[in-house]
Amino acid sequence: RDNKTATFDFSACSLEWQNTVAQAISQIDGLKTTQLPSPVMAVLTALEMKCTRYKVREDVMDQIVQEGGLEYATDVIIHLQQIDIKWDYANNVIIILPSGIAPDYLEQYSRFELRLRKHLSLAEESLWQKCAQKLIAAIPHIPEWRQPLIALLLPEKPEIAHEIAQRLLGQKKLPSLEWLKIVATDEHILASLEKYHEPYAIFDDYYCGAIWSATVLQEQGVAALPRFAPYTASDYCADVLRHINHPFALTLLIRVAGHTKRCHDRMTKACAAFPHAAMAALTELLGQKEENSWQIGRASCRER
């Protein structure tokens, strides 16, 4: 940085990790191959993500999977969760330490980490099972605030999200538990997680809100619609919902149509696109005695 040579401080790490970090530092200017131990590759990846202008992207994970295999890539992700990097800019010191302290904000997962999700989804069953077992076995050794990533990587096993939620919801407020909404399916756990919709709002995120909303619907279908209720007035989630031909999606949009002009416009477009779902939604609203919402939706349908 600023053409100055940084120094490293990893004295807070265990002896085993100190040896790993020292080996990684010796490889910074060398050839980085999957012949390196996976913990060393994890340190090198963490340094790239934290200390360079160009963040580690999906193609880096693609290369690791291609050269080292999916199990190796899984090991890299597991080890990556166990370390953290801080940069003391004033003294130009890069500090590597255990990742035990949770931030008080919702930390986004890197594109590098999330790319493993795609590779796992494309793997043959036997290989997927091996990688899934690695990830599940690693959970007790990963700091609590980073454990939701494991559930996120294994949407085929919502019970992992349920176990993490049941274990951590009553202990402390961890912003990262918001991520469990993407893969959890249990109604009671989802209801408990609702307290996390403010101020974190994973489905209202500027960068990925629409993507995660669409992902949940693709993986879980219309059964996932109720969890979007707190986010229906937001642009990113609602822009996805207006393309869903289902009465409950229309019900959600009609309920918030009076909030803003954009909310009303989305509801109007959805009613025009899916008139039968709109009529079913109006019938449901009338049955629940939601008079104001019914009047707004009815007026929109009559305009069409």
Question: What is the predicted function of each stretch?
Answer:
Residues 1-153:
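Non-catalytic protein-protein interaction scaffold segments in large eukaryotic complex-forming proteins
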Residues 112, 116-200:
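Long, low-complexity, highly charged intrinsically disordered regions
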Residues 206, 210, 234-238, 250, ...:
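Residue-level detector of extended alpha-helical repeat arrays and alpha-solenoid scaffolds
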Residues 295-303:
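Residue-level detector of conserved catalytic or cofactor/ligand-binding positions
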